[in-house]
Structures are given as structure tokens and as C-alpha cells.
Amino acid sequence: MNRIDFEAHYYFPALMDYFSTRTDYPMYDRETKTFRRSGDFTLKHPYRLTHLEESLEERIKMMDEHGVQMQVLSLSSGVDFLSPEESILWCQRANDYVYEGMKAYPGRFQGFAALPVVDIDASLKELDRCMEGFRFVGWLADSNFGSSYIDDDRYFPLLEKLEQHNGALYIHPTQPIDERMTGLGPQLAAAPFGFGIDVSIALMRMICKGVF
């Protein structure tokens, strides 16, 4: 087995319990297995959500069945839409969860850091903790952060810190910052169309800005 799955998203029970208590986005309905990040980003997929929430032990079984040696775990969407205080807390707990999995199953799990990008100073501290203390491989960043792209000057300290740690930057798609993509649901805004467009925009902005 030498396959590495780096598109390995997860949720963990405590976070989903919290999402299920919320009455505003992001929120989770356990009865219908529906996660709503926004009006145009709704995941109603019981099978998929069940796998996102599965235990690390269950992941190991699935990995063995499919010949996957390692998963690089990354927190699925939601915490970046919380308040700064909540985002900091849940990013820390998510990264702790991944590190516990790395210790419990050596060589089977690695991690992309979850960072509370609404607070850059807190993100820098958390990135240090993940890269120095946990030996994560890098940071998974959304292609945009709701009102800004990763080439924005405010995120440069994070990119510089990541480079200092020789960490990988995984730019993950999300719905574009474009009103033309709203109002028609995930079919337009998400994976079928919007995701690919937004990653392309993010990459081209970084290239034109001189990030690369």
C-alpha cells in the first residue's frame, strides 16, 4: 500500500454537536443529515456526512479495504464562518483531534492545519503549534475567505510563516465571491461549476500578485 489520500476531510462529534445547536449558518440538522454553510452551500447527503463523521478506527478499516496507506486529514468547511473566538477554539480542537489520530495510528494519518483566518495573530500561533508541535504537512486554505482572496496583503504573514516551516499550501475550492453565483443553489455555486472557477481565480491572483 503506497496510496496517499490528501482529499480526506473530516468532522468530529463535538463540532457537529455544536453545529446542531446553531440557528444561523453554519448549522447542522442531525435528523436529516443536512449541513448548511450558507444559502447556496447546502450538503444534504447522509452517506457522505456519515463518512465525514466516522471515527478514526472506521477510517483505518476503509483505508485498508481500498489500499490507502495514509490520509492527510483536513477539517471540512464551517469553522471559518464562526466568530473569531469560536473559530479559534474549534480550530484548536480540530488540530488536537488530528494529532491524537496521528499518535494512535502512526504512519496512517497526517494533517493539514485548520486556521482561524478571521484572526491572523491567532492563526500564526496555531500554525506554529501545528507545524512545530504536531509536525503537520501544511495548511489547507479555501480559495477565498468570503470577502477576500489569499493574495490579500493581510494573509502574507501566514504564507511567510508557512514557507518558514517548509509547509505545503493546499488551495481548496469553495464558492466564488460573485453575486452571479448566488441564488441558484450548489449546482451553480459549488462543485459542478463554481469550485473550479474560484480555484482558477485564486491561483491567477496569486501569480499576478507575485506570491509565486
Predicted features, each with a name:
Residues M1-F212:
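Helix-coil boundary/capping segments in enzymes
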